[in-house]
């Protein structure tokens, strides 16, 4: 045993339906010496393996550990092993040994209010149970669910690891853009492209009886329905006319009407002017004739 290698035991309680997932995760992380038991009473925790001179009891249990290890190596997805000899009261060992891993490797453990750790503390050194059980209620947030069981004391963040789906897509120019349906820095909520049925019904209830919503009502719709002002106004414009908005003006029609009015007002004056010019011309002609005859 190398003096630089440190070993610890981990007692983990997981649901029966998550045994396969948990075992696959442990093997993928390099933990090979793993055994499953039905209850903590079947566990025989040997002495601290970090001691230079292991006791005789640890040597006597070593054969069962190697047997469990070979069984887990040959059949990784095998069901929990049970004792075949009914006379033996200590059939298996629940342990997790680190092989070729740094000292800061994470060890999954479970939060539990079970008094079993207190019963084991009489026969097991206290340092082996450190950080394995929470004996006092903590104000820290609950650990996240990991493959069906609670994991505390994890040294790495799975959300930033291979389990996290990256929403950024390369555009071919060496830069990245955000997925159109994923959250981004400008809008944390996913992009909504279509109104839902309850949102339509809520707006219809507000604008019933041809009531156009006020500014306060529009702001209330924005908050409760989580819609933009543009989406709301477009939905209302298809069903109601905004009374506060002036009707649209056709400038071509307006110019034509103005021209017609101008023409209708200018016709009588033009006729009078033309008649006066004709009379004056006749007077000039008559005067010129009288002068020539005289």
Curated annotation (Swiss-Prot):
Composition bias type Basic and acidic residues, residue spans: 250-265
One GO cellular component term noted in the UniProt record for this chain: nucleus
Subcellular compartments: Nucleus
DNA-binding region as annotated in the record: 192-232
GO biological process: determination of left/right asymmetry in nervous system; negative regulation of transcription by RNA polymerase II
Effects seen without this gene: RNAi-mediated knockdown leads to misexpression of markers of the asymmetric state of AWC neurons.
Tissue expression: Expressed widely, including gut, the amphid sheath glial cells, and head and tail neurons including AWC, ASE, and ASH. Expressed in AWC (ON) olfactory neuron but not AWC (OFF).
UniProt-listed InterPro entries: HD
Main location: nucleus
GO molecular function terms attached to this record: sequence-specific DNA binding
Region (Disordered): 43-119, 167-191, 238-274
Compositional bias (Polar residues): 52-63, 81-115
Keywords, sorted A to Z: Activator, DNA-binding, Nucleus, Repressor, Transcription, Transcription regulation
Biological function: Transcriptional regulator which binds DNA consensus sequence 5'-CCTTAAC-3'. Plays a role in establishing and maintaining asymmetric cell fates in chemosensory AWC neurons during larval neuronal development. This is achieved by repressing the expression of multiple AWC (OFF) genes, including srsx-3 and hlh-11 in the AWC (ON) neuron. Activates expression of sox-2 in the AWC (ON) neuron.
Protein name: Transcription factor nsy-7
Gene it is expressed from: nsy-7
């Amino acid at each position: 045993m190398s003096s630089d290698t440190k070993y610890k035991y981990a007692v983990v309680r997981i649901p029966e339906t998550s045994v396969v997932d948990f075992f696959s995760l442990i093997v993928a992380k390099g933990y090979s010496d793993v055994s499953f038991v039905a209850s903590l009473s079947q566990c025989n925790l040997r002495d601290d393996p970090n001691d230079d001179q292991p006791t005789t009891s640890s040597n006597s249990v070593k054969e069962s550990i190697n047997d469990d290890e070979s069984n887990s190596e040959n059949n990784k997805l095998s069901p929990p092993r049970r004792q075949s000899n009914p006379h033996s009261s200590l059939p298996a060992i629940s342990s997790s040994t680190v092989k070729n891993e740094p000292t800061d490797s994470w060890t999954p453990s479970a939060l539990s209010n079970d008094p079993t750790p207190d019963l084991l503390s009489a026969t097991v050194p206290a340092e082996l149970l450190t950080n394995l059980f929470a004996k006092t209620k903590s104000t820290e947030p609950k650990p996240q669910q990991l493959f069906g069981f609670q994991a505390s004391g994890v040294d790495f963040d799975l959300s930033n690891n291979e389990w996290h789906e990256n929403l950024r897509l390369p555009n071919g120019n060496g830069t990245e853009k955000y997925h159109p349906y994923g959250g981004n820095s400008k809008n944390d909520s996913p992009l909504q492209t279509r109104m839902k049925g309850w949102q339509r019904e809520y707006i219809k209830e507000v604008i019933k009886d041809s009531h156009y919503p006020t500014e306060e009502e529009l702001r209330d719709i924005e908050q409760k329905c989580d819609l933009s002002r543009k989406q709301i106004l477009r939905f209302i414009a298809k069903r109601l006319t905004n009374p506060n908005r002036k009707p649209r003006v056709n400038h071509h029609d307006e110019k034509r009407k103005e021209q017609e009015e101008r023409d209708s007002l200018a016709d009588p004056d033009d006729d009078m002017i033309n008649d006066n010019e004709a009379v004056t011309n006749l007077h000039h002609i008559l005067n010129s004739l009288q002068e020539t005859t005289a």
